[in-house]
Swiss-Prot record:
NDH-1 shuttles electrons from an unknown electron donor, via FMN and iron-sulfur (Fe-S) centers, to quinones in the respiratory and/or the photosynthetic chain. The immediate electron acceptor for the enzyme in this species is believed to be plastoquinone. Couples the redox reaction to proton translocation, and thus conserves the redox energy in a proton gradient. Cyanobacterial NDH-1 also plays a role in inorganic carbon-concentration. GO terms for molecular function: NADH dehydrogenase (ubiquinone) activity; quinone binding. GO terms for biological process: photosynthesis, light reaction. Pfam families: Oxidored_q4. This is NAD(P)H-quinone oxidoreductase subunit 3. The lineage of its organism: Bacteria, Bacillati, Cyanobacteriota, Cyanophyceae, Synechococcales. GO terms for cellular component: NADH dehydrogenase complex; plasma membrane-derived thylakoid membrane. Belongs to the complex I subunit 3 family. InterPro entries: NAD(P)H_OxRDtase_bac/plastid, NADH_UbQ/plastoQ_OxRdtase_su3, NDAH_ubi_oxred_su3_sf. Its EC number is 7.1.1.-. It is a multi-pass membrane protein. It comes from Synechococcus sp. (strain CC9902). It comes from the Bacteria.
Length: 120
């Protein structure tokens, strides 16, 4: 098929993987009803009649807590494989993990010092 014959199946997989979502979106666009008024513009609240407007302002502090959570959630994702392979990796990997944790603790201390974790 092309210059690397061992990768024909992989190229076919990539083409199919790209074509399936595009085909699904095009099919949806062609077959979906075209109504743009009425209940489609209302906010969905678990089958109940909507109360109030859909646009409300959230306190920015929610976003700060979410960012801190995401940072430490990603830390957990990176440290779990390291912990599983701890015996095989040796001292250098342990030092690298300590540096990684130290950098994140500095970020936490900075956020704490700036008052990002205060709710007053």
């Amino acid at each position: 098929m092309f210059a690397l014959p061992g990768y024909d199946a992989f190229l076919g997989f990539l083409l199919i993987a790209a074509a399936v979502p595009v085909l699904a979106l095009v099919t949806n666009k062609l077959l979906a009803p075209k109504s743009r008024a009425g209940e489609r513009q209302l906010t969905y609240e678990s089958g109940m009649e909507p109360i109030g407007g859909a646009w409300i302002q959230f306190n920015i502090r929610y976003y700060m807590f979410a960012l801190v959570f995401v940072i430490f959630d990603v830390e957990t994702v990176f440290l779990y494989p390291w912990a599983v392979a701890f015996n095989r990796l040796g001292l250098l990997a342990f030092i690298e993990a300590l540096i990684f944790i130290a950098i994140l603790l500095v970020a936490l201390a900075y956020a704490w010092r700036k008052g990002a974790l205060e709710w007053s």
